[in-house]
């Protein structure tokens, strides 16, 4: 209803101003601004809904604001371009419509009415309401009854007898198992669900609606609310450090805790969370690539589910034979939005719905087959009698190609338990939520029946039963949950440990690189990883007077305030205000001590604008003073006009990438010397090793031969035609995810370049 009211007010404002208000620059600007805000809000809602399926929520703040480079970005490029073009077109059309009667005299009453209607359209819009609620949830003081409902369990299980296998199915909500709605979609896993304890009403609450949040909720009994935004959990060195979670209790009770997934463990800080809470054995894409049968068999996120579950089965066998008490957690990925992936070993590779193939449903049907096969192996083993198997979704499906069909059903998360020691077949329709999962498992294993805000669904009463308004109640508890982080509120002194690549202050530790916004009562960490925006782009969003501490590789800040460090890959610390004074300090000791020193200076807006503009220069447009092309820093020497076919900088250099261009092209501002030596320090990737690699300047071509290790080769060129472009053609670019950013399409690697130098020859 609010959508219709909001749109009606918007339309009325446009029509009244266009036909009645007449000419007035101020009223035109004010009305266009408010109407434009309405458009931006609704496009933001549309874009957020495209990713989350639930509008503007904590998942948007946590995962999408700074994490798109790790979220399968290639699949969202076209929708993103469409949104930008649509926004431009709408603004242009709005301006044209509002100025239709610009030659008529101004009418104050109609102008005021149009502006009020525009303001009303913004206020009534769902996007404004959702953002307002998010802002309120950040600023509340908390709820006095939080302490009464938050309960810490005993740190041990008195007499543990059962091993635990816990399977998180990515977005594998219970709705998929409705055979009437989706016939024969999940026959294998659905049959296993019906053999166990099936909890049919597992609700999704705020702060539990994306993977790491679902894991925190199910293991710690609390939503993931944090004192920072974006993907900062990937940067912290501990995760809810004061809380007792399921992994802590298992470890204290003699369990060895294992976690296996196909994606990179660093994504969203899963490695930090698990290591902080009892898990000593973690396997992700980096750890598995040396042990899996085919390390090249991967999707955009990591290894396929059949590979991951095969490794999980091997680990289950190994641990069961050892006689050691253990827990084995695993997380699938093939059902990740927007389309999912199909493992090659599946029999169920295609599922048609609504008269046509549906990729998301196909991925679900394939993944559930793999999960069921893994469970059936355990059930057929002699160790099943000592094992509890848990299968749950990490969260409800986000906006995938099946989402509109899911939304027609009563949606719930998946949670069922198969007990090898005590077979029990029952569907339990108790009202519950994801936070109850850990408490229920703990109860089955012989521990307490409560965990944080979670309660066992076998012997306790869920918060979802106690509070009819549990979603609002959860948001009211948000400040109380944030306080559980024990996060510092000030930063005066800090220490940088170069061996561990961490910064420590006020009892907290963070991974480097890191940007910090420092105010009187708050310190906000903003990390950089493969999954967040570069720190300089984040810093460019700071206000002129915002205090910052920026710890990064020296060359990244050198172009602003320390040109002498333009080629240094050491750590540097910069601090100050963008509109005031800044200092850059070189970290020259293994353990380096620093102090914050923010001077109360007059803000120079011209300086601020210059700093922001420089911070926003894209990597390929950065230029530095050097007599050679150094590939492990961003940009190129001043003599280079442009270049293409080259991937991003890495610690050693850069790969050629045929996805960006079949050839490596480096165009110089001026013609290359008549006679020169080309000194190339590089290596080859895969089948490009020991193959002739053409290197061209104008009409002259030389051959470069590289191995898999870095070597330096000198080629001699004559350049009678005054050519200004160097071309290198890798003979056989290889499609691979090696060293790739999680969620990105594979790169096509040819040669790895460390340095290229042009040396003029005499004569």
Swiss-Prot record:
- Where would you say this protein principally sits, based on its record? membrane
Mind telling me which residue stretches traverse the membrane in this protein? 1-21, 26-46, 77-97, 108-128
Q: Where in the cell is it found?
A: Cell inner membrane
Which superkingdom heads the taxonomic lineage of this protein's source?
A: Bacteria
Q: According to the UniProt entry, what is the EC number of this protein?
A: 2.7.8.20
Q: Which InterPro entries match?
A: Alkaline_phosphatase_core_sf (IPR017850), DUF7024 (IPR054288), OpgB (IPR020881), OpgB/LTA_synthase_biosynth (IPR050448), Sulfatase_N (IPR000917)
Protein keywords:
Cell inner membrane, Cell membrane, Membrane, Transferase, Transmembrane, Transmembrane helix
What is an example of a Pfam family matching this protein? Sulfatase
Q: Which SUPFAM superfamilies is this protein grouped with?
A: Alkaline phosphatase-like
Q: What name does UniProt use for this protein?
A: Phosphoglycerol transferase I
Q: Lineage of the source organism?
A: Bacteria, Pseudomonadati, Pseudomonadota, Gammaproteobacteria, Enterobacterales
Which gene underlies this protein?
Answer: mdoB
């Amino acid at each position: 209803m609010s959508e219709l009211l909001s749109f009606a007010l918007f339309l009325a404002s446009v029509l009244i101003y266009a036909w009645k208000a007449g000419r007035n620059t101020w009223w035109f600007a004010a009305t266009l601004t408010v109407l434009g805000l309405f458009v931006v809000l609704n496009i933001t809602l549309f874009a957020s809904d495209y990713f989350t399926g639930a509008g503007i929520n904590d998942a948007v703040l946590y995962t999408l604001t700074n994490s798109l480079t790790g979220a399968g970005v290639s699949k969202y490029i076209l929708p993103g371009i469409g949104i930008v073009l649509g926004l431009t077109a709408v603004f242009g059309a709005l301006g044209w419509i509002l100025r239709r009667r610009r030659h008529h005299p101004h009418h104050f009453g109609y102008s005021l009415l149009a502006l009020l209607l525009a303001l009303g359209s913004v206020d009534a819009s769902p996007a404004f309401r959702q953002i307002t609620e998010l802002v309120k949830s950040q600023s509340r003081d908390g709820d006095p009854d939080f302490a009464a409902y938050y309960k810490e369990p005993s740190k041990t299980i008195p007499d543990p007898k059962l091993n635990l296998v816990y399977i998180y199915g990515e977005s594998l909500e219970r709705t998929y198992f409705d055979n009437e709605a989706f016939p024969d979609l999940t026959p294998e896993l659905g049959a296993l669900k019906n053999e166990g304890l099936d909890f049919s009403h597992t609700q999704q609450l705020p702060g539990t609606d994306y993977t790491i949040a679902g894991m925190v909720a199910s293991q710690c009994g609390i939503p993931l609310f944090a004192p920072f935004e974006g993907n900062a959990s990937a940067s912290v060195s501990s995760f809810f450090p004061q809380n007792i979670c399921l992994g802590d209790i298992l470890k204290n009770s003699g369990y060895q805790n294992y976690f296996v997934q196909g994606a990179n463990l660093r994504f969203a800080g899963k490695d930090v969370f698990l290591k902080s809470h009892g898990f000593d054995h973690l396997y992700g894409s980096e750890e598995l690539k040396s042990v899996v049968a085919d390390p090249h068999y991967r999707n955009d996120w990591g290894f396929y589910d059949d590979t991951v579950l095969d490794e999980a089965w091997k680990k289950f066998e190994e641990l069961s034979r050892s006689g050691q008490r253990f827990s084995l957690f695993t997380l699938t990925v093939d059902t990740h939005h927007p389309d999912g992936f199909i493992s090659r070993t599946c029999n169920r590779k295609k599922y048609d719905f609504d008269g046509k193939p549906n990729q998301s449903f196909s991925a679900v049907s394939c993944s559930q087959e793999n999960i069921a096969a893994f469970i059936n192996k355990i059930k057929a083993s002699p160790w099943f009698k000592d094992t509890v198997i848990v299968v749950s979704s990490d969260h409800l499906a986000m906006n995938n190609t099946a989402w509109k069909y899911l939304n027609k059903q009563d949606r719930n998360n998946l949670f069922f338990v198969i007990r090898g020691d005590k077979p029990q077949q029952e569907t339990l329709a108790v009202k519950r939520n994801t936070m109850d999962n850990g408490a229920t498992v703990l109860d089955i294993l012989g521990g307490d029946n409560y965990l944080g805000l979670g309660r066992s669904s076998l012997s306790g009463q869920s918060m979802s039963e106690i509070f009819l308004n549990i979603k609002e109640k959860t948001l009211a508890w948000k400040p109380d949950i944030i306080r559980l982080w024990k996060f510092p509120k000030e930063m005066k002194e800090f220490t940088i440990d170069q061996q561990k690549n961490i910064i420590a202050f006020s009892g907290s530790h963070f991974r480097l690189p890191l940007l910090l916004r420092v105010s009187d009562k708050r310190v906000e960490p903003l990390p950089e990883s493969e999954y967040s925006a570069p720190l300089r782009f984040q810093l460019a969003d700071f206000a002129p007077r915002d205090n910052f501490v920026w710890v990064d590789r020296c060359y990244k800040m050198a172009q602003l305030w320390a040109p002498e460090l333009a080629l240094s890959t050491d750590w540097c610390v910069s601090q100050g205000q963008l509109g005031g004074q800044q200092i850059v300090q070189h970290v020259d000791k293994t353990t380096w001590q620093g102090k914050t020193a923010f001077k109360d200076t007059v803000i120079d807006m011209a300086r601020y604008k210059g700093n922001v503009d420089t911070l926003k220069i894209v990597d390929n447009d950065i230029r530095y003073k050097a007599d050679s092309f150094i590939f492990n820093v961003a940009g190129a020497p001043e003599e280079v006009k442009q270049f293409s076919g080259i991937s991003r900088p890495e610690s050693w250099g850069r790969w050629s990438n045929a996805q960006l261009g079949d050839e490596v092209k480096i165009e110089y501002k001026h013609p290359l010397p008549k006679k020169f030596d080309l000194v190339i320090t590089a290596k080859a990737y895969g089948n490009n090793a020991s193959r002739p690699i053409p290197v061209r300047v104008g009409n002259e071509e030389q051959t470069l031969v590289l191995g898999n290790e870095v070597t330096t080769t000198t080629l001699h060129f004559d350049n009678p035609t005054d050519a200004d472009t160097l071309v290198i053609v890798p003979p056989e670019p290889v499609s691979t995810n090696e060293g790739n950013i999680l969620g990105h399409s594979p790169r096509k690697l040819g040669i790895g370049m460390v340095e290229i130098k042009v040396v003029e020859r005499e004569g």
